[in-house]
Amino acid sequence: MKISVIGGGSWGTTLAQVLTDNGHETLIYDVNPEAVKKINNNIHPFFDNKITGIRATLDLKESIDYADYILLAVPTKFMRDSLRDINKLATRKLYFINVSKGIEPVTLKRVSEIVTDEITPELLGAYAVLTGPSHAEEVIERKLTVLTAASDVEWFRKSVQQLFSNQSYLRVYTSDDLIGCEVGGAIKNAIAIVSGMMTGYGLGENARAALITRGILEIVRVVVHYGGKKETAFGLTGIGDLIVTASSYNSRNFNAGLKIGQGTPVEQVLSESKMVVEGVRAIQAAKDLCVQTGIELPIIEITYEVIFNNMSVKEAIQNLLTRELKEEVIA
């Protein structure tokens, strides 16, 4: 099968290598000439790893015409514009596999909804999300990883499962809860930033364990609000993804929070990051959700004040600790 990857970043290039390992043909489209050059010279653009069997192009139309399936690996802030460009050039049905995690601020739309907005109905064949606890740094080293492919279309999620699964390092489960899987993957990035902030500020493992536990409850609230299944938040795409993202120095969101907690200005942290910190947009979107619906997300709401309104980490922690004492309610 032929797969075009839109976005030659760390994750897109790594998944292209997985597909090549599994015997498929892959073509990466990217707007960065240097990234395209590296890929065509068998060099991963972000890691010190050799890649094989992957071709890259600067020509979007070439990548669209080439593909049986299109893998969306661009940051969610660029997703709508990228889809508009794809829609203008497409001449046949498109089958999308999204691997980006985010919710659009203001509109509060998931990536699947943005796809529906921007792709002409006659051209939209099917959509799936591939998500779960995964660092590209480990997958490119072919270390054991387990993901979930979710879609409303049964044959398509099973096709994605077969596409990425192998017997050496990657296993994929399927889910019919597209909403729950998309939302869990987006909101966990916000909690990961908070985890990094607390670690950078000097708090210990006790605090991190509490944060992850309370954070998963905020993920559950958002999943249920969107119409997803509560149970999904306790699987790979929710708590699984949260654990790996909120406790690892390989996580760009955790590392961004870590630097903020250590006192580095937010603007400097974001400008110096080589990769997009998706958790910042997730925090913004979640705050918009709180304002528009009244849903209660205390951890994310107080983190919004740190990121966007210059509240100190010390004050944020104090605000959380001085909230009204309550009985623990699970979900």
Curated annotation (Swiss-Prot):
Keywords: Cytoplasm, Lipid biosynthesis, Lipid metabolism, NAD, NADP, Nucleotide-binding, Oxidoreductase, Phospholipid biosynthesis, Phospholipid metabolism
GO biological process, one term: glycerol-3-phosphate catabolic process
Organism classification: Bacteria, Bacillati, Mycoplasmatota, Mollicutes, Acholeplasmatales
Species this chain originates from: Acholeplasma laidlawii (strain PG-8A)
Binding residues annotated for sn-glycerol 3-phosphate, in chain numbering: 101, 132, 134, 188, 241, 251-253
Subcellular location: Cytoplasm
Residues bound to NADPH: 10-11, 101, 136, 252, 276, 278
NCBIfam families (alphabetical): PRK00094.1-2, PRK00094.1-4
Protein name (record): Glycerol-3-phosphate dehydrogenase [NAD(P)+]
GO molecular function: glycerol-3-phosphate dehydrogenase [NAD(P)+] activity; NAD binding
Signal peptide stretch: none
Job description of the protein: Catalyzes the reduction of the glycolytic intermediate dihydroxyacetone phosphate (DHAP) to sn-glycerol 3-phosphate (G3P), the key precursor for phospholipid synthesis.
GO cellular component, one term: cytosol
Gene: gpsA
